[in-house]
């Protein structure tokens, strides 16, 4: 965060974010040249600020219109001393946190397009290089560089002041800040495109920014709501991929791998949001939904009825077809797949979801649970075509293959007494298909059959579907 503090302090004095970054870069270059020979100063931050301000004086001397700023910075240098050893907070400002908050609001100013806000935030507040940002978003480096340059020019042309918004503008401006931070987190959590299911570095950067913002704006309930949401979602990152990097869906995850420390931090942040009266803000509501999952040590312990209620409230606070789709999933888990499918079918005509791969994926999942395998396969194939993420494409393609009706589990030569108890329990429950029985295949031991089935790496719902379509008739079960 030292980089952001340096830029924030310089922007406070110069009133120009672009110039502040240039001054900070010059100071860092000077440090790289001098510190190896002279040693690292006792207070590196103060040293960098002093060098940057001296560079600013050189620039301001060439421009009489900036004489006032020159005098102000000169007075600060006199106070700080030539050695630059004064306390960093005193060199920058009596309240550096205010400068950081101003920098956040400036980088996320609504005058900028959303992609520009994201790039500028990662550059100025995250300290990421243009190359790092480009790699994270699969965009050519020159594109990111130009995006940042244009953003700075736009701020200057619009005469955006380096300040926090007034009370009337603050809610809308804070909403813009939260949106940018969550966009960064989401791109890391579920990558839009490319061959990575996740990009954890973006998640961690967004989470860090969220924590800083919660310290800078402690009275804002939705700030704590966003922090809570990101903490809880980030807790699942270790369990969201398998050994080969393949996606692992929520209900299939090993919950023992969830980070309980992050969950506890998220629950604490959610409590702060609720104490501040923000329990029904969009981010706090999403955090409350995430908390329902976090509190369930097993998938079957999940309070789906409560999640359904929370999604209904969220749909009113933040109307969106995507929210309605998520609500349909919760309804299906609470009240059965047909209830969920009825809601999903109502969303099919939504223009915003026409090319949304998760609509087809959810519909395919519900159709599979209803035994409509052929229709489900078509939906999974469509989802596979629509997604731009490689691992997600492989996942939906595999689910499409698993929907084929000719997938069987061969138990030739088995006695019913030798069928594993786990399988019998499933067959006596919701599985009512058939195993392949009496074929020409050689005898397969139950242990080997189950081992080979497990090695396929099928998601839990796909495994249930295979069993559903191929349950053993010898057990007296009818489809």
Language model features with spans:
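Mid-to-C-terminal alpha-helical segments outside catalytic/metal-binding sites
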Residues: 398, 431-434, 444-479
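Structural recognition of an alpha-helix C-terminal capping motif at a helix-to-coil junction
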Residues: 22-29, 42-54
């Amino acid at each position: 965060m030292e980089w952001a503090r340096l830029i924030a302090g310089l922007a406070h004095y110069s009133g120009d974010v672009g110039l502040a970054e240039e001054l900070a870069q010059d100071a860092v270059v000077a440090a790289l040249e001098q510190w190896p020979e002279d040693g690292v100063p006792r207070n590196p931050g103060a040293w960098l600020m002093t060098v940057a301000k001296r560079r600013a004086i050189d620039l301001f001397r060439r421009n009489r219109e900036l004489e006032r700023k020159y005098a102000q910075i000169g007075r600060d240098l006199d106070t700080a001393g030539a050695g630059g050893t004064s306390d960093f907070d005193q060199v920058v400002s009596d309240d550096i946190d205010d400068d950081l908050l101003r920098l956040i609001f400036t980088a996320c100013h609504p005058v900028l397009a959303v992609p520009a806000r994201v790039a500028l935030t990662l550059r100025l507040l995250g300290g990421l290089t243009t190359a790092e940002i480009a790699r994270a978003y699969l965009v050519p480096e020159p594109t990111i560089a130009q995006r940042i340059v244009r953003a700075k020019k736009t701020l200057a042309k619009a005469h955006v002041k380096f300040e926090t918004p007034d009370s009337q503008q603050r809610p809308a401006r804070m909403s813009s800040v939260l949106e940018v931070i969550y966009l960064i987190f989401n791109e890391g959590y579920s990558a839009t495109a490319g061959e990575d299911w996740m990009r954890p570095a973006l998640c961690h950067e967004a989470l860090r920014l969220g924590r800083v913002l919660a310290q800078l704006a402690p009275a804002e309930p939705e700030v704590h709501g966003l922090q809570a949401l990101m903490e809880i979602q980030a807790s699942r990152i270790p369990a969201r991929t398998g050994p080969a990097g393949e996606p692992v869906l929520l209900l299939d995850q090993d919950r023992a791998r969830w980070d309980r420390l992050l969950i506890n931090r998220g629950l604490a942040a959610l409590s702060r949001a609720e104490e501040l009266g923000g329990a029904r803000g969009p981010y706090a509501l999403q955090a409350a939904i995430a908390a329902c999952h976090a509190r369930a040590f097993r998938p079957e312990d999940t309070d789906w009825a409560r999640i359904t209620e929370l999604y209904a409230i969220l749909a009113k606070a933040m109307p969106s077809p995507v929210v309605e789709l998520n609500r349909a999933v919760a309804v299906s888990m609470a009240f059965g797949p047909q209830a969920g499918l009825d809601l999903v079918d109502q969303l099919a005509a939504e223009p915003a979801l026409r090319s949304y791969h998760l609509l087809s994926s959810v519909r395919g999942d519900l159709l599979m649970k209803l035994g409509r395998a052929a229709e489900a396969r078509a939906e999974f194939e469509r989802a596979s075509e629509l997604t731009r993420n490689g691992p997600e494409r492989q996942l939906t393609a595999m689910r499409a293959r698993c929907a084929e009706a000719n997938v069987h589990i061969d138990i030739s030569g088995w006695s019913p007494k030798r069928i594993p108890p786990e399988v019998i329990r499933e067959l006596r429950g919701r599985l009512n298909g058939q195993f392949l029985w009496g074929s020409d295949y050689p005898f397969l031991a139950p242990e080997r059959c189950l081992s080979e089935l497990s090695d396929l790496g099928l998601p839990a719902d796909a495994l249930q579907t295979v069993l559903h379509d191929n349950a053993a008739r010898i057990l007296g079960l009818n489809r």
